[in-house]
């Protein structure tokens, strides 16, 4: 019945759009009067996919809220599913109204960072929380062909960075060091994204943002460099985290989830570059392409989000959480996933085996479960508390080394200033030695002795004494002439 209702709604919307377009009352975006006749079918087709991208995720979210048996997992999974309708709505609004394109793009970029954080927290929740995740990492080892058997079974694992990252970043030891590095690397992107979005809005209001203009008097290139480095580091941390836990999370098919999420993030960025390159090379021609040059990216995103909404139904299903209605609530759904359509593996079944006995729900168990309003409240407030704690943790761990670095720089400058003052003080207290005869005046006096030694001659004590007396007499005569 639910699927029939969704299909009927889609058919009704399509029929209304076709009838309105047929009678000429289909509204057109503000691209000019001449372009209106070409934009009826792009807007109509984009609207159909946007409706799909809204209805299917909403249906999936309601399914998760109705079977809200694993709050730690589902609260962030719902935030991840919301990525599709958010992208679809803002792209459609940007396609319709060019004046709202900038604000819509800022919202999309901010939610991208939030979705990246939600995906990481969802994987951690599937591993039964932070403590169990760190314990699992500490049990991992890196075993190669040259590693002795006994040594490999008791040594901790190490995450090695590829070139050129290994030239700047030390290897991470699996455990608290690796977990905190990944956590900070992902949360910092969410924080910087919000800060840069606020700065972009302020600069745009003053007309000095200059989106797409790489000029020193605009703020766009500086914010773009900061965000690109931040995003690259966050995605790198997520990939490293996935590589460590992918075998542990095999029952929930993490590869499909990871590729689905990553494709949405990367496609929206790379396709914009490809479209701009095609237009710059003149490979895309035609009046429709020229009219949609500035909005073709939004149109493509609308189409992609409709497809992604269908994919999410199979990648992030609510069926494993519905099975939790017949067992204790505080048990992870790892074996529920494994029992649906994954071939049973003895080790995985043993590893994901429940510590409590399954049972049918009684009346008291139903009362312990959250109802629909309580589930919504937990998604909003519960996830908000975790986000605030992670942001506070990240800021404290980032600000502390920055403060130490600034303090070290201040001490260095203070030491340099003290040395300069000490040198100036010594220079003032030193006596004036301008009356001293320069050394070049004495050069001729010692040249005779040097020539005598060089010619092989000897200098006796008496000869040296006479020479000294001769030099003293010459010096006294020279001093007398200088005083005159």
Swiss-Prot record:
It comes from the Eukaryota. The chain crosses the membrane at residues 42-62, 76-96, 190-210, 219-239, 264-284, 299-319. GO terms for cellular component: plant-type vacuole membrane. Residues 344-364, 459-484 are annotated as: Disordered. InterPro entries: Ostalpha/TMEM184C. Residues 347-364 have a biased composition (Basic and acidic residues). It is found in: Membrane. GO terms for biological process: negative regulation of brassinosteroid mediated signaling pathway; vacuole organization; vesicle-mediated transport to the plasma membrane. Disulfide bonds: none annotated. It is a multi-pass membrane protein. Residues 1-19 form the signal peptide. Its main location: membrane. Residues 406-428 form a coiled coil. Keywords: Coiled coil, Membrane, Signal, Transmembrane, Transmembrane helix. It holds the Pfam family Solute_trans_a. PANTHER family: ORGANIC SOLUTE TRANSPORTER-RELATED (PTHR23423). Belongs to the TMEM184 family. This is Protein LAZ1 homolog 1. It comes from Arabidopsis thaliana (Mouse-ear cress).
